[in-house]
């Protein structure tokens, strides 16, 4: 499988089966991380981690505190598309990491980025 990253009218294709998405909460300044798998059904959220807790970021039932991180497995199905929009309130956007390295996405307020599994041709799938 491949991950398509759509931004500013362009598509970047990463040949990966999994990735980690991380960002800083705009109010609490707390770090969030999510592990995703790229599947034919969509992007599957496997595990999420929150560094602490605070306003609007309470860990869900069943979360385990380990080394300062609340770790849990979200109960959501595959997502055809994940849309990220920068607030500009944190000074940075998202970090997307794979076994190949990391990319910084959406640092500027108003930047919209979409993540989705690529079609068999390596391009964005029709919506």
Question: What are the residue ranges of the model-derived segments?
Answer:
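N-terminal secretory signal peptides
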Residues: 4-59
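Mature, soluble, non-transmembrane domains
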Residues: 58-127
């Amino acid at each position: 499988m491949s991950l398509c990253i759509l931004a500013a009218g362009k598509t970047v294709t990463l040949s990966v089966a999994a990735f980690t998405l991380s960002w800083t909460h705009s109010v609490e300044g707390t770090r969030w991380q999510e592990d995703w798998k790229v599947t034919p059904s969509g992007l599957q959220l496997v595990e999420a981690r929150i560094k602490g807790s605070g306003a609007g970021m309470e860990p869900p039932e069943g979360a385990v505190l380990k080394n300062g991180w609340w770790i849990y497995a979200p109960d959501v199905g595959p997502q055809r598309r994940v849309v990220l929009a920068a607030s500009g309130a944190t000074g940075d956007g998202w970090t997307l990491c794979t076994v190949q390295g990391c990319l910084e996405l959406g640092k500027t307020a108003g930047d919209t980025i979409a993540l989705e599994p690529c079609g068999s041709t390596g391009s964005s799938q029709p919506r």
